């Protein structure tokens, strides 16, 4: 299975947008990975950075804008989490929490395959385990401060792993990056991996 990191984007299609996600699915990807942050009015939206300048060329932090203020700006197309989930039924979604947000009310459709992840263990450990989604952390190595019994999977970044190491924890292993199944490169690379 191939997962498009922030969708399939290029110079003409911005990352973490509906266009990037549509492009990924139209090019054979089975799932998408995207990042969640909150606006000033606490709307969960899809955006990797806390600031708007890199992707949209606009000064300011996401947390300083309401969702309506973002909609009013030209050339900013930041989707709400709810819209992404409703649009891509029956698709794999790896949802990375960039801050502490309880998104579980959006994940009630068991038809979707949701993986909620974060580099910050505290962001996912406060969420309850459910049959509707899987909880995990993103890491470079195993971390003794993490209670793996509260998780369903671990994502290992660009590292060599040993399946026996994870088998005793009964965790699903998701390998992240070029050596694995999630990538943010062009569609040709998808076939090389």
Predicted regions: what they are:
Residues 1-193:
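Phosphate-group recognition and catalysis centered on beta-loop-alpha active-site segments
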